[in-house]
Swiss-Prot record:
Keywords: Cell membrane, Membrane, NAD, Quinone, Translocase, Transport. Belongs to the complex I 49 kDa subunit family. It comes from Acidothermus cellulolyticus (strain ATCC 43068 / DSM 8971 / 11B). NDH-1 is composed of 14 different subunits. Subunits NuoB, C, D, E, F, and G constitute the peripheral sector of the complex. One of its GO terms (molecular function) is NADH:ubiquinone reductase (non-electrogenic) activity. InterPro entries: NADH_Q_OxRdtase_suD, NADH_UbQ_OxRdtase_49kDa_CS, NDH1_su_D/H, NiFe-Hase_large. NDH-1 shuttles electrons from NADH, via FMN and iron-sulfur (Fe-S) centers, to quinones in the respiratory chain. The immediate electron acceptor for the enzyme in this species is believed to be a menaquinone. Couples the redox reaction to proton translocation (for every two electrons transferred, four hydrogen ions are translocated across the cytoplasmic membrane), and thus conserves the redox energy in a proton gradient. It catalyses: a quinone + NADH + 5 H(+)(in) = a quinol + NAD(+) + 4 H(+)(out). This is NADH-quinone oxidoreductase subunit D.
Length: 440
């Protein structure tokens, strides 16, 4: 154990003033040379405009930000450590609570990593992959709507808040119908998805697709040409491509700087290479460019969802491996659909072997060959990666999340320093951090 002097100066070049040393005239002269309005303030962690319990330590000279430091960790929940004490299936229920605004992306990245270690990536049913893509794109739109609503509210556009949450509610109703929950779904599982789409889900999604394009046009009419909105975002929070790459920023931050880096295109998964969509980019690298990128991404997600609905064919939604899938998941009805309550009731009540098999899988889980993998997906905030290590048992040896919120927060100093204190709100909002994922 190493001991350190708590009174040591962290920065050797910083001036040290004591009551027993130094020439007081020199001390007074040194302080007099500083800006008379220099102050240090805390923004957060209890602040309505920091997207959760984010703390910013700002050094100000008048209204200008001379230094911006990020303090994280206030929402640490030990998700990664808890996964080491749960089976590979149970870990999904923890990971879905990391980035609580886009849980389906964390679930997918984790399940893809497990499937890669199991060597069953190519065995995932087509219907399961289509459902995964469709759910993720719905979740992408929902996440961007929260960003639009909260970001608009923070800079005074209260109408954007009302409209954003209005449309998001439609998506949450779809999620509730399909997964049973509005958030923290644990719907995507190793090998596929937990259950098939219920009756009426496709119709409800098509209804949303009919409504949403006009609503996006409404957002543009409301905000894109609005003078106050443009002045609050244009030229604010600038970060060029060199800075974004140096700081590891991904997602809309990088695409707003002009680089079309999207993992759905450059490293496809779940069959994304077969879908027709564009990667929106801008070149200005400011808050307004990030706003335009996210608005365009919602349109592209609608295109992908439309293609998913056209590709839905009857079939299983779980890999046909009895060592991984529960017996009820391997049943198909006459219509080609599976996982209805009738199927589960029939299998669990008539087959003792199936009941025993189900009990063993639920209580002990399945074994995953030893090894380690890293699997990234394109979340609404950027590259969300899962580094999974297996020791050959039924529980993960290590699960690490490469959370884009955590990495992207490194850009706070770059986008805030030199600007006005009022622009800090807009700059942080354009980064769109979710502290549940950042602190996890």
């Amino acid at each position: 154990m190493t001991t350190t002097d708590p009174f040591d100066v962290l920065d050797p070049t910083a001036p040290v003033y004591t009551v027993t040393g130094g020439d007081w005239q020199d001390i007074v002269s040194d302080i007099a040379d500083r800006h008379p309005d220099r102050i240090v303030v805390n923004m957060g962690p209890q602040h309505p405009s920091t997207h959760g319990v984010l703390r910013l330590v700002l050094e100000l000279e008048g209204e200008t930000v001379t230094q911006a430091r990020v303090v994280v960790g206030y929402l640490h929940t030990g998700i990664e450590k808890n996964c080491e004490y749960r089976t590979y299936t149970q870990a999904v229920t923890f990971l879905t609570r990391a980035d609580y605004l886009s849980p389906l992306f964390t679930e997918t990245a984790y399940c893809l990593a497990v499937e890669k270690l199991l060597g069953i990536t190519d065995q995932i049913p087509e219907r399961a992959n289509v459902i995964r893509v469709m759910m993720m794109e719905l979740n992408r739109i929902a996440s961007h709507l929260v960003w639009l609503a909260t970001g608009g509210m923070e800079i005074g556009a209260l109408s954007a808040m009302l409209y954003g949450f209005r449309e998001r509610e439609m998506i949450l109703d779809i999620f509730e119908m399909i997964t049973g929950l509005r958030m923290n779904h644990a719907y995507i599982r190793p090998g596929g998805v937990i259950q098939d789409l219920p009756p009426g889900a496709v119709e409800k999604i098509r209804e949303f697709l009919d409504i949403m394009p006009a609503r996006i046009d409404e957002y543009h009419d409301l905000l894109t040409g609005q003078p106050i909105w443009v002045r609050r975002l244009k030229g604010v929070g600038y970060l060029d491509l060199t800075g974004a790459v140096a700081l590891g920023a991904t997602g809309p931050i990088m695409r707003a700087a002009g680089y079309p880096w999207d993992l759905r295109k450059v490293a496809p998964y779940c069959g994304y290479e077969t879908y027709d969509f564009e990667v929106p980019t801008q070149t200005d690298g400011d808050c307004f460019a990030r706003y335009l990128v996210r608005m365009d991404e919602m349109r592209e997600s609608l295109k992908i969802i439309e293609q998913c609905l056209d590709r839905l064919r009857p079939g299983p939604v779980m890999v046909e491996d009895k060592k991984i899938a529960w017996p009820a998941k391997l049943a198909l009805g006459p219509d080609g659909m599976g996982n209805s309550l009738d199927h589960i009731r029939h299998i669990m009540a008539t087959s003792m072997e199936a009941l025993i098999h189900h009990f063993k899988l639920v209580t002990e889980g399945f074994h995953v060959p030893p090894g380690q993998v890293y699997v990234p997906v394109e979340s609404p905030r950027g590259e969300l990666g899962v580094h999974l290590v297996s020791d050959g048992g039924t529980k993960p040896y290590r699960v690490h999340l490469r959370e884009p919120s955590f990495v992207n927060l490194q850009t706070v100093a770059a986008v805030c320093e030199g600007g006005m204190v009022a622009d800090v709100i807009a700059a942080v909002a354009s980064i769109d951090p979710v502290m549940g994922g950042c602190d996890r």
